[in-house]
Swiss-Prot record:
It comes from Herpetosiphon aurantiacus (strain ATCC 23779 / DSM 785 / 114-95). GO terms for biological process: glutamine catabolic process; pyridoxal phosphate biosynthetic process; pyridoxine metabolic process. One of its GO terms (cellular component) is glutaminase complex. Pathway: Cofactor biosynthesis; pyridoxal 5'-phosphate biosynthesis. Keywords: Glutamine amidotransferase, Hydrolase, Lyase, Pyridoxal phosphate. The lineage of its organism: Bacteria, Bacillati, Chloroflexota, Chloroflexia, Herpetosiphonales. One of its GO terms (molecular function) is pyridoxal 5'-phosphate synthase (glutamine hydrolysing) activity. Belongs to the glutaminase PdxT/SNO family. This is Pyridoxal 5'-phosphate synthase subunit PdxT. Its EC number is 4.3.3.6, 3.5.1.2. The active site is at residues 78, 174, 176. Catalyzes the hydrolysis of glutamine to glutamate and ammonia as part of the biosynthesis of pyridoxal 5'-phosphate. The resulting ammonia molecule is channeled to the active site of PdxS. The keyword Magnesium does not apply. InterPro entries: Class_I_gatase-like (IPR029062), PdxT/SNO (IPR002161), PdxT/SNO_CS (IPR021196). CDD domains: GATase1_PB.
């Protein structure tokens, strides 16, 4: 199995390092011809408007949507989660492309600016009893989930920060910045 990591902007190298530590082959995806070579795709954190525009510029938006329709597992972290969302709480920036694959409403920068970034331990039942140490950097949150979406983790105040819909996975935080590979293992099992 080869896992693609969208490598247009953002924390793609950290995802590759985590996957390679699990013995999984990776490929940086920048072009449609690279997308056809992978069985799964991670869309990393970064800046969602920039990544969305680059998806269009490099002719990847529709091919990713098509691969998702064919059942390819896709995981979006932070900005990647925003790109997966069907809806954005405060609306999309004018002209902002998005994949719109997952029946969630995401809210950008839900916790504030860069200075408000934080780390916390989350209870994630699908990962077992041990808490998952999550890193939130200018993180979004999920305001609303559709009927087919399973909430995987919430903060103590109830804000949803991880969800799954079929073979789509979304995390508001950055599992690739921790030494804990459990979310990567979960994704590999989708």
């Amino acid at each position: 199995m080869t896992v693609g990591v969208l490598a247009l902007q953002g924390a793609f190298i950290e995802h590759e390092t985590m996957l390679q530590g699990l013995g999984v082959a990776t490929l940086q995806v920048r072009l449609p011809e690279q997308l056809v070579q992978v069985e799964r795709l991670i869309i990393p954190g970064g800046e969602s408007t920039t990544i969305g525009k680059l998806l269009v510029r490099f002719d990847l938006l529709e091919p990713i949507q098509q691969r998702a329709a064919e059942g390819m597992p896709i995981w979006g972290t932070c900005a990647g989660m925003i790109l997966l969302a069907k809806e954005i709480a405060e609306g999309r920036v004018e002209g902002q492309p998005a994949l719109g694959l997952m029946d969630i409403t995401a809210r950008r920068n839900a916790f504030g600016r860069q200075v408000d970034s934080f780390e916390t331990n989350l209870q994630v039942p699908v990962l077992g009893e041990a808490p998952f140490h999550a890193v939130f950097i200018r993180a979004p949150q999920i305001d609303k989930v559709g009927e087919a979406v399973e909430t995987l983790a919430s903060l103590d105040d109830g804000r949803i920060v991880a969800a799954r819909q079929g073979k789509l996975l979304a995390t508001a935080f950055h599992p690739e910045l921790t030494g804990d590979a459990r979310f990567h293992e979960l994704f590999l099992g989708l």
